[in-house]
């Protein structure tokens, strides 16, 4: 089981029925296929259990996990530039004239197509967890763009996907700032030793504190000067550590050893059973964390 490292959280904006059996058929229409000789990139669905299963979904207790794979061809700009310049020089020498800009632009496409079959590929996988009980979708990635790209693939697969980023009633940065200023956090949480503070002004400064007591005069000075906390490292129930950001994304998830070892009694050779047990454990813990965090930050914005 690949334990999630990050969470970009989205709310289903209206009630839709997402059933694993139906989704399995829909995902099969867009399974991942490798890039052809002239493809720059390809994206599609693969089994969340990797080579251990052909199933494109895995479900338990109303939780569904799916996995998108992307292949991108790597063509460094200097390589393209060098090949293009060589081609331009040869043509200009052969024809005894300078090429026009439109001709050079056309040549660039030719050069790209000639280089593509020899380009290296970069592969990436993005896990997505659908909580049908609470109407949430979580994407295991650190960037909003990557999350939106993965959601776009799912939207294309299903035909529609009404989701919006999870939004809270109160500005997150103001709540986080008050937690650091007062040293008092929501029940079940504990301040760790890392934060980022930003000035409210457009071109204001940024302070990144690491391995530092956040409830200190030094940090208080920055808050008094008008900076707000935009990232904050927290511990939840001594079970999960993470960084909460002002866009409600959760980064650098770290599960305690006791939690990760909870299913050690299951034979590792039985991959499917261990995957299922870890998936149930992880989603149960993260669903509880998200609920506690949303409540602690003042509740979800009314839709």
Swiss-Prot record:
Its main location: cytoplasm. It comes from the Bacteria. GO terms for molecular function: double-stranded DNA binding. It is found in: Cytoplasm, Nucleoid. GO terms for cellular component: bacterial nucleoid; cytoplasm. GO terms for biological process: DNA recombination; regulation of DNA recombination. Pfam families: RdgC. Keywords: Cytoplasm, DNA recombination. May be involved in recombination. Belongs to the RdgC family. This is Recombination-associated protein RdgC.
């Amino acid at each position: 089981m690949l334990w999630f490292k990050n969470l970009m959280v989205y709310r289903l904006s209206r009630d839709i029925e997402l059933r694993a059996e139906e989704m399995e058929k829909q995902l099969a229409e867009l399974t991942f296929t490798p890039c052809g000789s002239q493809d720059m990139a390809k994206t599609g669905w693969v089994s969340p259990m990797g080579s251990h299963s052909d199933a494109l979904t895995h479900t338990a207790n109303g939780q569904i996990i799916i996995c998108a794979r992307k292949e991108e061809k790597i063509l460094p700009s200097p390589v393209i530039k060098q090949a293009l310049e060589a081609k331009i020089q040869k043509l200009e020498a052969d024809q005894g004239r300078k090429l026009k800009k439109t001709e050079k632009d056309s040549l660039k496409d030719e050069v790209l197509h000639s280089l593509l079959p020899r380009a290296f590929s970069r592969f990436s996988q993005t896990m997505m967890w659908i909580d049908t009980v609470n109407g949430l979708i979580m994407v295991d990635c650190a960037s909003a763009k990557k999350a939106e790209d993965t959601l776009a693939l799912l939207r294309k697969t299903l035909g529609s996907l009404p989701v919006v980023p999870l939004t809270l009633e109160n500005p997150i940065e103001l709540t986080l700032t008050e937690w650091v200023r007062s040293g008092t956090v929501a029940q079940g949480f504990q301040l760790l030793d890392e934060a980022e503070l930003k000035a409210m002004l457009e071109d204001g400064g940024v302070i990144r504190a690491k391995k530092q007591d956040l409830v200190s005069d030094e940090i208080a000075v920055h808050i008094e000067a008008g900076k707000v906390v935009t990232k904050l490292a927290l511990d939840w129930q001594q079970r999960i550590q993470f960084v909460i950001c002002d866009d409600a994304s959760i980064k650098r998830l770290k599960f305690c050893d006791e939690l990760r070892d909870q299913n050690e009694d299951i034979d590792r050779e039985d991959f499917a059973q261990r995957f299922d047990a870890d998936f149930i454990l992880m989603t149960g813990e993260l669903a509880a964390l998200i609920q506690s965090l949303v409540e602690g930050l003042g509740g979800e914005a009314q839709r």
